[in-house]
Amino acid sequence: MINQQNTSNNVIQELQNQIGEKIITSFDMVAQDRSNYFAKNPYQHQRPSIESANSIVNGYAKCNGGISAAANLVPGPLGMLAVAPEIITVMRNQIAMIYDVGVAYDKQQYLNKELLAGVLISSLGTGLITPGINAIANRVIIAQGSKIIARKVSTPIFQDTARWIAGKYAQQVLKSSVSKWLPGVGATAMGLWSAYSTKQVGNKSIQIFEKEIEILDDTQSLNECSIEYTDNFLPPSDIEVNNITGERLELLKIKTLINLMKVDGSIEPEEKEYLKTIITNANLTSAEIQEIKNSLSVQRIEVDYSLIAKYPDDALGLLIDLIALAKRDGDFHITEKMYIKQVGKLMGFSEVDVAELMLSC
């Protein structure tokens, strides 16, 4: 279990490095590109409006979903390194989307790299600026009543912020078991993640740009600060998860996938092969494997989804896996939809979020 966790952490670190170095310069590059575009199209009827904000978001979400769904996945965590270029493209499109939404809300004069990064960071939580990521978000963006303050920071601080964002994205991508081990179905899972995350970024952009924006130059006062973006934000080890939940997350996820396969009355041979691949690579103990074998004859396995809900990235990864598996044959059964909606609700997702995910890709 420890070896697999080390491998996963190493892959996250490498993905973070590959994505981070490209994303550091992407904020300024994309902002300049979009600024040039709107300078060439200066007339009001050529510019996005508040009324078009949702269609802007939907357009980028569809585009990003298609990019990731076409990715050529290789089995195993190390194979996920091959999709770094697609992840970078998705993130750049998300930055462009934030800029376009900002223009729609007539906030173009405030759209510097710090504000763009702050919107992206805030979309990784559940509130406007979620307390759990305040330590990072507050470097570049602060919610103060009805006002949003974007803080101009020094180059080293911004670079650390961009690397943290890259690490968070790498961590989210690797939460999908289907993406890692079932390339044929995994491409669908990647497409779902890209479309969903883009929609989340877009919705957060609208929420933020509805407010008053102010720019604060903090390059001097924050010059000596640094962000601890590596150790504190890597996923907890299997042992830590076991101590917290009493049952490892991977086992809970597999039980949930089995329930999905059983929802139409029986587990098909193809589904058994999928299950075998995931179990083999989950690095389960012999006792856990035996528990799974025993549960195959049970009509429905009991799973405490509140335990998974404590880990939002894992919960999202599981929800995406469920939808990708259900859609694999092109026939998304009503019983599968009902089960996924129920699981999503128990893990804390809104009906709207689950519905949007099921409609993606």
List the predicted regions and their residue ranges.
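Alpha-helical membrane association modules
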Residues: 2-226, 251, 267, 272
